């Protein structure tokens, strides 16, 4: 069979090639999110003003994740501790900025003459802010859409208040006081319920205007926290230690790959075996890093450990496969090559099942700080079993001429 024909038949090799291309493109365009330990940043330990239920704690995590992601932060990790503490880790974030966003209750109210007309519960969606230059600085606006009930309540006030201000508060701080236009009041009086509203503000610089608008948008989109959060500790984490660890891990990985290749070449007395091993191992690393880049998954120390573990378990599988193909051939066993490979893959699959079961328990158990470890380990092992191990076996057969 020609080399091209063999490649067409072995679709897994085409998958590996595609993975290399997609991963390289994604890394060049998007890069990869690094965790707090590798990039540095801020860790905030906060306490709720009263013990909360599990449901309320889960809601707190959801609100904070939405708020911080909307603001533009990447690599966020939030870990509840008990019923009244929460740890928030934000790579590359200034401490003051982090604390302000985390501790904002997010309570929105629109009042007319001191009486609440609409609240955050009446907001259906929030659009991206708009910034425009005006005399003396910059004006920002954050448009949002009311629910049908919110629009009804707003119309009840608007129809009798032409030219009057509606004061909008966020956490009891007035952020905007737009006036009800004559046209809006007349439309409300005729039964029209306006659902498109906006909060307007201003700042001296464009950067300040963008920040204020993004903060309003993030808080409105995420909603109100079920309990007030009080910071108990704010820590700036240096990236030096993590970066040194990352460099050492890369160097150690390269040395380990080279050492394994040499040892296997000596063991089986054939230097040609080293090539497929290096190709297979590097393909799995590229897959995992590319996957993290594409999905926005954060590579922190646990995730890095998961990558190392999946590669280590992969080397074990390669040795099992090599032993069956090479040594089985030399022993001239009365067993066909297909049967020997089948025997090797039964061991590989059993190893994967055991590893996946252990990692699944770790993931489901809710140990948030170790989920990255479990995800990377399972993803790497799965890709290896389905794609790279079969390709390795085929490459080895072709190189050794045992087909």
UniProtKB/Swiss-Prot annotation:
Pfam families: Sec_GG, SecD_SecF_C, SecDF_P1_head. It comes from the Archaea. The chain crosses the membrane at residues 13-33, 245-265, 285-305, 306-326, 347-367, 368-388. It is found in: Cell membrane. Coiled coil: none annotated. The keyword Cytoplasm does not apply. The keyword Protein biosynthesis does not apply. It is a multi-pass membrane protein. Keywords: Cell membrane, Membrane, Protein transport, Translocation, Transmembrane, Transmembrane helix, Transport. One of its GO terms (cellular component) is plasma membrane. One of its GO terms (biological process) is intracellular protein transmembrane transport. InterPro entries: SecD/SecF_arch_bac, SecD/SecF_CS, SecD_arc, SecD_SecF_C, SecDF_P1_head. Its main location: membrane. Signal peptide: none annotated. Belongs to the SecD/SecF family. SecD subfamily. PANTHER family: PROTEIN TRANSLOCASE SUBUNIT SECD, PROTEIN-EXPORT MEMBRANE PROTEIN SEC. Involved in protein export. Part of the protein translocation apparatus. Forms a complex with SecF. This is Protein-export membrane protein SecD. It comes from Methanopyrus kandleri (strain AV19 / DSM 6324 / JCM 9639 / NBRC 100938).
């Amino acid at each position: 069979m020609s080399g091209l024909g063999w490649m067409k038949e072995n679709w897994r090799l085409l998958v590996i090639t595609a993975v290399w291309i997609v991963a390289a493109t994604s890394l060049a365009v998007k890069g990869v999110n690094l965790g707090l330990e590798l990039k540095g940043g801020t860790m905030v330990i906060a306490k709720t003003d009263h013990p909360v239920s599990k449901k309320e704690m889960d809601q707190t995590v959801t609100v904070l994740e939405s708020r911080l992601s909307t603001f533009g932060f990447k690599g966020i990790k939030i870990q509840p501790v008990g019923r009244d503490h929460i740890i928030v880790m934000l790579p590359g974030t200034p401490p003051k900025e982090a604390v302000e966003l985390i501790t904002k209750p997010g309570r929105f109210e629109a009042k007319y003459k001191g009486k609440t007309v609409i609240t955050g519960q009446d907001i259906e969606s929030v659009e991206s802010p708009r910034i425009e230059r005006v005399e003396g600085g910059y004006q920002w606006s954050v448009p949002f859409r009311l629910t049908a009930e919110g629009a009804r309540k707003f119309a009840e006030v608007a129809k009798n208040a032409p030219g009057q201000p509606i004061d909008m508060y966020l956490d009891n701080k007035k952020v905007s006081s737009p006036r009800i236009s004559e046209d809006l009041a007349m439309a409300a009086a005729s039964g029209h319920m306006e659902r498109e509203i906006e909060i307007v503000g201003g700042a001296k610089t464009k950067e300040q205007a963008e920040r204020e608008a993004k903060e309003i948008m993030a808080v409105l989109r995420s909603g109100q926290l079920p309990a007030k959060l009080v910071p108990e500790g704010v820590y700036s984490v240096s990236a030096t230690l993590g970066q040194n660890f990352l460099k050492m891990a890369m160097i150690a990985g390269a040395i380990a790959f080279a050492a394994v290749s040499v040892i296997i070449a000596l063991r089986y007395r054939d230097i040609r075996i080293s090539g497929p091993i290096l190709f297979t191992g590097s393909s799995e690393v590229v897959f995992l890093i590319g996957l993290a880049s594409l999905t926005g998954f954060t590579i922190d120390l646990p995730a890095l450990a998961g990558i190392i573990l999946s590669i280590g378990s992969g080397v074990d599988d390669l040795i099992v496969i090599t032993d069956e193909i090479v040594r089985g051939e030399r022993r001239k066993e009365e067993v066909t090559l297909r049967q020997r490979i089948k025997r090797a893959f039964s061991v590989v699959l059993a190893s994967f099942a055991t590893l996946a079961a252990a990692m699944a328990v770790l993931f489901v158990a809710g140990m948030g700080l170790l989920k990255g470890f479990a995800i990377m380990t399972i993803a790497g092992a799965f890709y290896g079993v389905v794609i790279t191990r079969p390709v390795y076996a085929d490459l080895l057969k072709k190189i050794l001429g045992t087909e």
